[in-house]
Amino acid sequence: MTISSDLILKGSILIREIEKTFLDLFSKGKLNGTVHTCIGQEYIGALLPKIINYDDVVFSNHRGHGHYIGKTDDVEGLLLEVMGSESGAVGGVGGSQHLYNKKGFFSNGILTGMSAVAAGYAFAIKNEKKIVTYFLGDGGLGEGILYEALNLISK
């Protein structure tokens, strides 16, 4: 597989600019709820479409904007969602952290909150030619559910 560094750089810059826009809108009180950006982690989201297939599934965390863009390429849906618009990715009710896309993207604002769901999904499709990707941060490593999920999928 050849991965174009130019495309990854462009994707990283796009994600960074979107995140900066969210921070600006948040500071002006134009967003409902909170916003957790992935600034400093943009490369991961930009690289994602190069390392997974269309049918693969992504479970993300509270800093999942870059993952969302990388998996779905739905920049407009993300922007509208975080701004609370009914035209957003999940009708304006999910906000920054609770995102979904029928292309196979799920996120949750609770640290390691998707670990058991991702493990169950992976178990359910274990005979298919798909990959389940799960993103977590180090802050979730103290949560018991993560280790239970890892035990389930290690069998």
Enumerate the language-model features and the residues they cover.
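Cofactor-/ligand-binding subdomain signature composed of acidic, glycine-rich
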Residues: M1-N32, Y54
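Cofactor-binding active-site loop characterized by glycine-rich and histidine/acidic residues
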Residues: K20-L23, K30-K155
